[in-house]
C-alpha cells in the first residue's frame, strides 16, 4: 500500500439523543473529540481537522491545539459536513480525506493509514472503507451490524443490515429455529462493515448534489447513495475488529475503563 499524504477530518456534532454533549465527554482529562484527534495525529495524516457546528467544541479543540473548522448546523449527514470542509479548505480534487468518527477515541492509527492507502491504490474508486470477518452468529442477524459483500476486485457489491450473503445450506428452517447466537456460521465469511471512510475531495464536493436513493432510505445507510449513483467503493478487509465507539453512557464507561491501559502503552 502507498502511504501518500492525506487529511483526516473528524465530524463532531454536539447534539446527540443518546449521549448529550458527546464530543465534550471527558476521557482521561480531555474531551473525547480531542482524544480522537490525538489518535488521528498518530497516523500518517498530513493534517487533522475537527469539523463541528458547535463553538464550544471548536473552542475545546483549540485549547488543546487541535485545528477546528466551524460548519453549518443544517447538514443532513457527516459526509455533507465533510463536503463543506473540502470546499472551505480548498482541497485539490485528488486530495484524499479520511472521515474519522468523532466517537471512536480508541481507533487504531494504522487503520486510518490503511484505509487512505487503500483508496490511493484503487484509482477507479471514489471511496474506500473497511470490513472484518464476523465471528459471532448473533452479529450476523443483528440489524445494527452492517454487512458488506465484495467483488473479486475488493469493491463493495452491497451493504445491508440484513444477513448478507444468505447462507441457504447453513440456515435451514431447523437452524433458524435456534436462537441467533446458536445458529451455524456459514462457510463463506460474512464481513462486518467498519464505519471509517476515505474519499477523494472531488467526490465529496459532488455528494451534496446527489439525490437520496430509495435503497439508502430503506436501509438508512448513507454509503448506498454513492453506489446507487454508480460510484465504486473499495473495501479493505482486516482480520481485527476495531474497538467499539461511544453511543451510550455505558459505552463511555467502558472506554474510560480501557483508557488507562491505552495510556500505559502510548503515553498521555
Swiss-Prot record:
Extract the SUPFAM superfamilies matched here: Nucleotide-diphospho-sugar transferases
InterPro entries membership: Cytidylyl_trans, KdsB, Nucleotide-diphossugar_trans
Disulfide connectivity? Answer: none
> Function of this protein?
Activates KDO (a required 8-carbon sugar) for incorporation into bacterial lipopolysaccharide in Gram-negative bacteria.
Pathway annotation:
Nucleotide-sugar biosynthesis; CMP-3-deoxy-D-manno-octulosonate biosynthesis; CMP-3-deoxy-D-manno-octulosonate from 3-deoxy-D-manno-octulosonate and CTP: step 1/1; Bacterial outer membrane biogenesis; lipopolysaccharide biosynthesis
According to the UniProt entry, its GO molecular function terms are: 3-deoxy-manno-octulosonate cytidylyltransferase activity
- Source species, domain of life: Bacteria
Which principal EC class is assigned to this enzyme? transferase
Name listed for the protein in its UniProt record: 3-deoxy-manno-octulosonate cytidylyltransferase
Keywords noted in UniProt: Cytoplasm, Lipopolysaccharide biosynthesis, Nucleotidyltransferase, Transferase
Q: State the similarity comment.
A: Belongs to the KdsB family.
Q: Which GO terms describe its cellular component?
A: cytosol
Q: Where in the cell is it found?
A: Cytoplasm
Q: Entry's Pfam families?
A: CTP_transf_3
Q: Which GO terms describe its biological process?
A: CMP-keto-3-deoxy-D-manno-octulosonic acid biosynthetic process; lipopolysaccharide biosynthetic process
Q: What organism does the record attribute this protein to?
A: Ralstonia nicotianae (strain ATCC BAA-1114 / GMI1000) (Ralstonia solanacearum)
Q: What is the lineage of its organism?
A: Bacteria, Pseudomonadati, Pseudomonadota, Betaproteobacteria, Burkholderiales
EC id: 2.7.7.38
Catalytic activity annotation: 3-deoxy-alpha-D-manno-oct-2-ulosonate + CTP = CMP-3-deoxy-beta-D-manno-octulosonate + diphosphate
Amino acid at each position: 500500500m502507498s502511504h501518500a499524504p492525506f487529511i483526516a477530518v473528524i465530524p463532531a456534532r454536539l447534539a446527540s439523543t443518546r449521549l448529550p454533549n458527546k464530543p465534550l465527554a471527558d476521557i482521561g482529562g480531555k474531551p473525547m473529540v480531542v482524544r480522537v484527534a490525538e489518535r488521528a495525529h498518530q497516523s500518517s495524516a498530513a493534517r487533522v481537522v475537527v469539523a463541528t457546528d458547535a463553538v464550544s467544541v471548536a473552542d475545546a479543540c483549540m485549547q488543546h491545539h487541535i485545528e477546528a473548522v466551524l460548519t453549518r448546523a443544517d447538514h443532513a449527514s457527516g459526509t455533507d459536513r465533510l463536503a463543506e470542509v473540502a470546499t472551505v479548505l480548498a482541497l485539490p480534487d485528488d486530495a484524499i480525506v479520511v472521515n474519522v468518527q468523532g466517537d471512536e477515541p480508541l481507533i487504531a492509527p494504522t487503520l486510518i493509514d490503511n484505509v487512505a492507502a487503500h483508496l490511493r491504490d484503487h484509482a477507479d474508486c471514489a471511496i474506500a472503507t473497511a470490513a472484518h470477518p464476523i465471528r459471532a452468529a448473533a452479529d450476523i442477524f443483528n440489524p445494527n451490524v452492517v454487512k458488506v459483500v465484495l467483488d473479486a476486485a475488493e469493491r463493495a457489491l452491497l451493504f445491508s443490515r440484513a444477513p448478507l450473503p444468505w447462507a441457504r445450506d447453513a440456515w435451514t428452517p431447523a437452524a433458524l429455529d435456534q436462537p441467533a447466537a446458536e445458529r451455524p456460521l456459514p462457510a463463506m465469511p460474512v464481513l462486518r462493515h467498519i464505519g471509517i471512510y476515505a474519499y477523494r475531495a472531488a467526490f465529496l464536493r459532488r455528494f451534496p448534489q446527489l439525490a437520496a436513493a430509495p435503497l439508502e432510505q430503506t436501509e438508512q445507510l448513507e454509503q448506498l447513495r454513492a453506489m446507487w449513483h454508480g460510484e465504486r467503493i473499495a473495501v479493505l478487509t482486516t482480520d481485527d475488529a476495531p474497538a467499539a465507539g461511544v453511543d451510550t453512557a455505558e459505552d463511555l464507561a467502558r472506554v474510560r475503563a480501557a483508557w488507562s491501559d491505552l495510556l500505559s502503552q502510548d503515553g498521555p
